[in-house]
Amino acid sequence: MEKNKMVSQGNQEPTATPDTMVQPFAAIPFPPPPQNGLSTDYGSQHTQEYATQSTEHGIPLYGGGQSHAEHSTPATSTANASSTTDGSQTEGQQSQTQNSENSESKPTPKRLHVSNIPFRFRDPDLRQMFGQFGKILDVEIIFNERGSKGFGFVTFETSADADRAREKLHSTVVEGRKIEVNNATARVMTNKKSVTPYGNGWKLSPVVGAVYGPELYAAAPGLQADVSLATEAGVPLPGPRGVNTYIPLIIPGFPYPTAAAAATTAAAFRGAHLRGRGRTVYGAVRAVPPTAIPTYPGVLYQDGFYGTELYGGYAAYRYTQPATAATAATAAAAAAAAYSDGYGRVYTADPYHALAPATSYGVGAVASLYRGGYSRFAPY
């Protein structure tokens, strides 16, 4: 019995269950990085008491199973983030593709030019004639002060409808008129080159140029000594021998005043009493008799209207009466035989002056013609 007691008292501790036993293959945790200046040996003594992990490096403090789970979590999140990014990129590409398709599929308006349409046509008539081929954005018929000019423009929403209307309606007969339908094009303004009548490219005559630069045209005699020697001048021109020649800033053949007159002219142009009118230079130009200038046509007026005969007397200019008229009757007869119209043209006996108007074209006949077959409001 004592033996039984001894056996029963041999081990009084409860039998350890498998759950409470330590796992034989537990992974050795890595020591955390030093924090707050503490060594790694101190931090590794209490590994099992703290269930936290380092926020800086993400190294777990537990065994291998938990570490694998925690490592797999950021990988999964990274995969999700990458898939989300790919999805957003795909959506962006799809939206861009849709935008490009919308821009490509957007209809392009097209404008047609319709000519030789009936003159009574108005915008609703033209819209009704072309509206069967598609949506019309604008219709315009060109008018002037006398009515329709017989042509207009039709703008379709799409170019396909415009092309179909042009193919169907071109060269069709509407109210006896064969209409023409073509694509409207922008009017091209031709650049007409102005032909300069001067040999060296000058466009201002010396008289007009003297108003802008009196010192230039009122040059001193020393500058006019020899035109051909002034090679350090201003404008190169192709010479007769194929080389560039130079002309000076003065114009050959122009009647320049003297040096004193040039100074007087420049001072007069700067004065306030003339108010910008170049009377001095113009008077100097008029004082010189006109000479033939082949290079500058039209510089000096050689017409008699600007000569001294204009100021020779009103009666001598307007009327050409005989000087030997003794009586008033003789003077009247001479004036009737030769008279003027005020512009220097002298008329004598004209055989056409004796013609009488034809009887068939009287006032009544002309009025009936006007009221019958002719209307001044016809467009053409």
Swiss-Prot record:
Residues 1-117 are annotated as: Disordered. One of its GO terms (molecular function) is RNA binding. The record marks R111, F119, R120, N144, K149, F153, R177, R187 as: Interaction with RNA. InterPro entries: Fox-1_C_dom (IPR025670), FOX1_RRM (IPR034237), Nucleotide-bd_a/b_plait_sf (IPR012677), RBD_domain_sf (IPR035979), RBFOX1-3 (IPR017325), RBFOX1-like (IPR047131), RRM_dom (IPR000504). Its main location: nucleus. Gene3D superfamilies: 3.30.70.330. Residues 110-186 form the RRM domain. PROSITE patterns: RRM. Residues 1-20, 36-56 have a biased composition (Polar residues). This is RNA binding protein fox-1 homolog 2. It comes from Xenopus tropicalis.
